[in-house]
């Protein structure tokens, strides 16, 4: 993966988070603007550089955390896409790569003009094709979670949805208040 490819994909990811990547600087760093000022700079290896005086509020710290998470995630999946084997399946357009495969379930990705996109599929009985695609577009994390559930790596019964987690949080807070 080239520096340009990484920064282009990272720029897509940052814009989706309402952060503004600026043109590359002479030193090869990608500046990221937030709230009308430069928040940090990202290196081609995915490291995030910043001056602590720039991150002086909780909102600025949250924005910096988003940049750091995006830089690491994009580096992870771009490296995977670069090294992954092509997905061979009857009737499937070229360009998809196998990021993971387990128990008849495939996590695949492809690079498009609008950035990397991800999908999970079930393999056909004879493993010559794929079907029942769950398309996650640019949501790499969502595709990974779906792969873990569909493939059986994680049992559905052990995963809480947001509503269940909120109920647990409220119950724990209620217990904390009772015992104070």
Where are these regions (language model features)?
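A short, exposed loop/beta-hairpin motif centered on an aromatic-Gly-Thr core
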Residues: 128-140, 157
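Long, continuous compositionally biased terminal/linker segments
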Residues: 33-66, 70, 74-77
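Short aromatic-glycine-(Arg/Gly/Cys) micro-motifs in beta-strand/loop hairpins
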Residues: 109-133, 168-170, 174
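Short N-terminal "domain-start" leader segments
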Residues: 76-117, 159
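Negatively charged, low-complexity tracts enriched in Asp/Glu with abundant Ser/Thr
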Residues: 1-24, 61-96
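Conserved small/polar residues in nucleotide/adenosyl-binding loops
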Residues: 178-180
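A short, charged, amphipathic alpha-helix used as a generic interaction element across diverse proteins
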Residues: 139-151
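Amphipathic alpha-helical oligomerization segments
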Residues: 157-176
């Amino acid at each position: 993966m080239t520096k340009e490819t990484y920064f282009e994909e990272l720029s897509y990811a940052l814009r989706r988070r309402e952060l503004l990547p600026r043109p590359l600087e002479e030193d090869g760093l990608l500046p990221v603007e937030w709230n009308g000022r430069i928040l940090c700079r990202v290196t081609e290896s995915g490291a995030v550089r910043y001056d602590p005086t720039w991150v002086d509020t909780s909102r600025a710290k949250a924005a910096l955390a988003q940049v750091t998470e995006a830089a690491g995630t994009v580096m992870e999946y771009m490296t995977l896409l670069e090294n992954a084997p092509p997905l061979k399946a009857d009737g499937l357009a070229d360009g998809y790569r196998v990021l993971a495969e387990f128990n008849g379930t495939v996590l695949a990705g492809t690079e498009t003009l609008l950035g990397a996109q991800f999908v999970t599929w079930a393999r056909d009985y004879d493993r010559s094709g794929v079907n029942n695609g769950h398309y996650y577009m640019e949501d790499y994390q969502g595709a990974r979670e779906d792969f873990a559930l569909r493939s059986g790596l994680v049992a559905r019964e052990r995963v809480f949805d947001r509503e269940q987690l909120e109920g647990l949080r409220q119950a724990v807070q209620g217990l904390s208040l009772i015992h104070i």
